[in-house]
From Swiss-Prot:
Pathway: tRNA modification; N(7)-methylguanine-tRNA biosynthesis. It comes from Drosophila ananassae (Fruit fly). PROSITE patterns: WD_REPEATS_1, WD_REPEATS_2, WD_REPEATS_REGION. In testis, it is present at high level in hub cells, a niche for germline stem cells of testis. Ubiquitously expressed in all testicular cells throughout spermatogenesis. Ubiquitously expressed in all germline and somatic cells of the ovary. It holds the Pfam family WD40. Belongs to the WD repeat TRM82 family. Required for the Mettl1-dependent formation of N(7)-methylguanine at position 46 (m7G46) in tRNA. In the Mettl1-wuho methyltransferase complex, it is required to stabilize and induce conformational changes of the catalytic subunit. Required for binding of nanos mRNA and repression of translation by the mei-P26-bgcn-bam-sxl complex. May cooperate with mei-P26 and nanos to derepress the BMP signaling pathway. May cooperate with mei-P26 to suppress expression of a subset of microRNAs. May cooperate with mei-P26 to regulate bam expression levels in germline cells during gametogenesis. Keywords: Cytoplasm, Developmental protein, Differentiation, Nucleus, Oogenesis, Repeat, Spermatogenesis, tRNA processing, WD repeat. One of its GO terms (cellular component) is male germ cell nucleus. This is tRNA (guanine-N(7)-)-methyltransferase non-catalytic subunit wuho. Forms a heterodimer with the catalytic subunit Mettl1. Interacts with mei-P26 and weakly interacts with bgcn; required for the function or formation of the mei-P26-bgcn-bam-sxl complex. Interacts with nanos; may be involved in mei-P26-dependent derepression of the BMP signaling pathway. Interacts with Myc; the interaction may be mediated by mei-P26 and may be involved in the regulation of ribosome biogenesis. HAMAP family: TRM82 (MF_03056).
């Protein structure tokens, strides 16, 4: 998975085992992070005895195979390295930009915490994850970070006691796609594949404060607007604004296609926002909406800008906004591709220096390397029409009974 986001003044791009921090104005490289192929070399410990036992069994099998086939030692080593090689899943900055969190997937699932500076980043801890992460979010003061996984569990990791064990806070029955933590740290807001938005009290996370219900498909993204309001995007082709304290829907805006990514920028505090949505399988790649609050709970979409982003010609997976540009990542000719478009015109940005994309791909060690993006079609619910089959069988049974009576 390729992750990309803008944290002023840095454009952050993560892929494989590398994260690049780029100045979006002059596109110069601030710093970079490279993870080792084996996280055990930088402090990763086995999560539990069961996992350790499995790891020992794998080592025994590898050793036995090596003893039987000494001529294939190099091949066995390569296979082992491939089995444990990690890949970056999520990257997130703390609000003050002092900490950086990275989660990995692949052979070793872990949370890596860094102390970040403009020119470098220093590794603080490496903690194992039970499952692959799906979302990542720091609290407002950066003292802890929330990690959700593919099974719907949400864990809190301490960023002061960096080696402390995680605390299980809450759980969903399906994968959590996004998570918010309010600035006052009183509420944790999560959304999942089962079209639910849940508002949970903190620290008493056994107490659910409210639900924001109305979406008919997966809720792909959330963003805080004010102390009481959030915006959500969904696969049901809607963008909605909520008063999450009351669990009340305030605005529903129809989209031309399912929304799979959401980005929000504040233009005027608690009043005007730029809301960008990445569409799934649509002729337009990205739409940018101007969301305005007139008073209280009154919200409206007042303008729309479309960035086609050559949709349909390549597999778009992620995007971010950087003021006057939209940066989009995806797969083109089965390789990772990064493209920049001007928000105003929606066309390919002419101000991006020639060769910049190649430089970034080279820095990510992704140039010419096969890239398989996430299959977003699995996010949609699988529906089975059992009623039609039942009615058809019932109809045939009645017809057979009538024929028997006539006979």
């Amino acid at each position: 998975m390729a992750t990309i986001f803008f944290a002023d003044p840095e454009l952050v791009i993560g892929h494989g085992r590398r994260v690049l921090f780029v100045n979006p104005d002059d596109l110069q490289l601030f710093k970079e992070i490279e993870l080792p192929p084996d996280l055990a070399t930088c402090g990763l410990k086995v999560a539990d005895s069961k996992e350790q036992h499995c790891q020992h069994e794998q080592q025994d099998v590898a050793a036995a195979g090596s003893a039987k086939q000494s001529s294939n030692t190099a091949s066995a080593s390569a296979s082992k390295a491939k089995a444990i090689e990690v890949s970056i899943q999520n990257v997130s900055y703390s609000p003050d930009r002092q900490l950086l969190a990275i989660t990995t997937t692949g052979g070793q699932k872990a949370l890596l915490l860094y102390r970040s500076r403009m020119e470098h980043a220093r590794l603080l801890s490496v903690r194992p994850l039970a499952r692959a992460s799906s979302a990542l979010r720091f609290c407002s003061d950066g003292s802890s970070v929330l990690v959700t996984d593919k099974t719907g569990d949400c864990y809190q990791y301490d960023c002061v006691e960096v080696e402390a064990a995680p605390r299980l806070l809450l759980g969903h029955l399906s994968v959590v796609f996004d998570i918010l933590w309010t600035d006052d740290q009183q509420h944790i807001i999560t959304c999942d594949r089962d079209d639910k938005i849940r508002v949970t009290n903190y620290p008493a996370t056994f107490d659910i404060h409210s639900y924001c219900l109305g979406h008919k498909e997966f809720v792909s993204g959330l963003a805080l607007l004010t102390e009481q309001h959030i915006v959500s995007s969904s696969g049901d082709k809607t963008l909605r604004v909520w008063n999450f304290i009351e669990g009340k829907e305030l605005l529903i805006h129809q989209l031309p296609a399912p929304a799979v990514r959401l980005q929000v920028q504040q233009l005027e505090p608690e009043k005007v926002y730029q809301v960008a949505v990445l569409f799934y399988d649509h002729v337009d790649g990205v739409a940018i909406y101007r969301l305005e609050r007139s008073s209280g709970d009154n919200w409206a979409i007042t303008a729309t800008t479309v960035v086609r982003a050559d949709a349909g010609l390549w597999n778009i997976c992620n995007f971010t906004l950087t003021g006057n540009r939209v940066y989009v990542t995806g797969a083109e000719n089965e390789c990772l591709a990064i493209k920049a478009y001007d928000i105003g015109s929606g066309e390919t940005s002419t101000s991006v220096p020639d060769g910049w994309v190649k430089m970034v791909l080279r820095g990510l060690e992704a140039e010419g390397v096969a890239y398989l993006p996430e299959d977003l079609s699995v996010w949609f619910k699988k529906r089975f029409d059992n009623v039609s089959d039942y009615l058809e069988r019932k109809k045939r049974r009645i017809e057979e009974q009538q024929q028997q009576k006539c006979g």
